[in-house]
């Protein structure tokens, strides 16, 4: 059987944990395209970025939903899940990795913190075509259109492929399909978090802190992800794990640090 004749093998992961609604919607959507394997963190790991577990053993367990096998949990980060899935759970290399659907957008500087995006980037590092999906809300989430769009984009990526070391990050407004303004290709924006550490005291009088913040819009162009998604556009941003600032290379060479 040739690759064209068989159903694609699709690995599904997230950072909200295996009980998050988004991963169940995404897995169901992907089953219409291929054979699905779900490997996700046992607990929520939002904001873990590209962290991986060292010095502590990882535990893998089967997860059942409604008395039916759904996937495997890993006692680690989203990146751990990708590594373990590729090395020990999946018998063959997947044709596609999809991560999400995340609670909350992953645009602008949020991209750097995102475990959802990191799982997809780890897939690219391992040579697997990968996509990250995020929904722009933390509450009252409606994944109906997001699941539908995820399938549409995944089908196109399976057909067209992606350049090496490149993923797609799709951010989807939490609105009915009728309110979607369109789909735009964007760059990662420059909006940044305005953060605060809220201090409280435990029962012994010792201080502890909750991190709290708001993403402040600093872009005003439709080709920036956060600006566009706030206007009900689905945004698709190509990303890479190569963080080199090429614009600065020439200037840095002029410093003549080798002398």
Swiss-Prot record:
Entry keyword annotation includes Hydrolase: yes
Cellular compartments annotated: Cytoplasm
GO function terms (MF aspect): 5'-nucleotidase activity; metal ion binding; nucleotide binding
Cofactors (names): a divalent metal cation
EC number(s) recorded for this UniProt protein: 3.1.3.5
A Pfam family matched in the record: SurE
Catalytic activity: a ribonucleoside 5'-phosphate + H2O = a ribonucleoside + phosphate
Superkingdom: Bacteria
Keyword Nucleotide-binding assigned: yes
Cellular component terms per the entry's GO annotation: cytoplasm
InterPro entries (UniProt xref): SurE, SurE-like_Pase/nucleotidase, SurE-like_sf
Main localization category: cytoplasm
Entry's cofactor comment: Binds 1 divalent metal cation per subunit.
Sites where the protein binds a divalent metal cation: 15-16, 46, 102
Keywords, sorted A to Z: Cytoplasm, Hydrolase, Metal-binding, Nucleotide-binding
Family: Belongs to the SurE nucleotidase family.
Function: Nucleotidase that shows phosphatase activity on nucleoside 5'-monophosphates.
Protein name (database record): 5'-nucleotidase SurE
Source organism per UniProt: Chlorobium phaeovibrioides (strain DSM 265 / 1930) (Prosthecochloris vibrioformis (strain DSM 265))
Gene from which the chain derives: surE
